[in-house]
């Protein structure tokens, strides 16, 4: 198969994510590679590598921002935030439960967060994590509780946007429970969580995690959103836009932006499964310039229209995900 013989996007051969560990899947010469994103994994694992240059990073930022804003910065009436509304005192000041970019330059998640911080431009935004000596991501509990408690006392009416891995939220919630703290963040505050629990002894079902976020932080369940992304991609999926209260018990369906496409592939037949059936998630990402456009993941999902319901890693697949970086 060659580019000349491909007449439909579904015919593009997909490269497995595991190939990024062994091969340099880029058209960039070594001298032009100014950045590289690594997959998150155990210290014994060889990480995936996604190489970038200034031009590809510009496409990455251009890709992530409108879909992020569409899903996380929408107003209560469903309208999207205007460019002016994403800056200044009226915007949700983001708090990132990760180390800052300087400490983890190979994290695509933290690069994404820094892009969001720059786009929003809120002076109150902060990275409240740090890199431990063993390479794990730790939370600076003094910094995060000071930021959150200050706003729960309504010294500012600005709603908050808290972003982090699932396990970073577990760390934070455990700390708040230990200190018997319950915060009530300003109305309209939102949470974005991502990643899983592989290689962690403490796990929480999604609904329990979100219930605890509501209990300890005062963020309404319908304002808690999940993100799906990986270092090999340049676009992200979100489990629908901010949910109306009547929908929170329905399956959480992830959708990629319009410049990406999705298939759920049967591991037995190699063909796309029918609606409602389970298979491996395959993603076609036009934002992946200078790299591979079609990615075959090892994640299981249920086909839901143009989106998918995420089930988790396929059996025998290597554990990965940014939550692995949280000790």
Specify the residue positions occupied by each region the protein language model found.
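Short polybasic/polar patches that bind polyanions
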Residues: 21, 55, 215
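Active-site diphosphate/adenylate-binding microenvironment
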Residues: 2-38, 44-51, 66-70
């Amino acid at each position: 198969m060659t580019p000349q013989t491909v007449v439909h996007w579904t015919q593009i051969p997909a490269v497995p994510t595991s190939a990024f560990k062994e091969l340099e899947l880029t058209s960039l010469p070594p001298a032009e590679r100014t950045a590289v994103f690594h997959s998150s994994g155990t210290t014994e694992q060889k990480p995936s590598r996604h190489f970038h240059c200034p031009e590809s990073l510009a496409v990455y930022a251009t890709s992530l921002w409108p879909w992020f804003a569409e899903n996380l910065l929408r107003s209560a009436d469903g309208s999207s935030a205007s460019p002016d509304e994403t800056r200044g005192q009226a915007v949700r000041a983001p708090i990132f439960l990760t180390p800052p970019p300087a400490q983890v330059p190979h994290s695509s998640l933290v690069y994404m967060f820094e892009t969001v911080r720059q786009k929003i431009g809120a002076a109150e935004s902060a990275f409240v994590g740090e890199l431990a000596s063993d390479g794990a991501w730790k939370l600076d509990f003094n910094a995060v509780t000071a930021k959150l408690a200050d706003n729960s006392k309504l010294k500012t009416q600005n709603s908050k946007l808290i972003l982090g891995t699932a396990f970073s939220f577990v760390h934070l919630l455990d700390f708040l429970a230990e200190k018997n703290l319950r915060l009530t963040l300003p109305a309209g505050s939102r949470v974005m969580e991502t990643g899983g629990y592989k290689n962690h002894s403490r796990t929480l079902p999604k609904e329990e995690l979100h219930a605890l976020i509501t209990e300890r932080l005062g963020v309404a369940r319908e304002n808690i959103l999940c993100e799906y992304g990986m270092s090999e991609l340049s676009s992200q999926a979100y489990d629908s836009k901010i949910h109306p209260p009547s929908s929170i018990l329905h399956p959480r369906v992830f959708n990629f932006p319009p410049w990406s496409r999705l298939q759920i592939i049967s591991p037995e037949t190699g063909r796309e499964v029918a609606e409602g059936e389970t298979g491996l998630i395959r993603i076609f990402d036009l934002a992946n310039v200078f790299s591979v456009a079609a990615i075959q993941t090892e994640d299981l999902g249920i086909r839901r229209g143009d989106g998918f319901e995420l089930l988790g890693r396929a059996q025998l697949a290597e554990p990965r995900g940014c939550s692995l970086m949280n000790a």
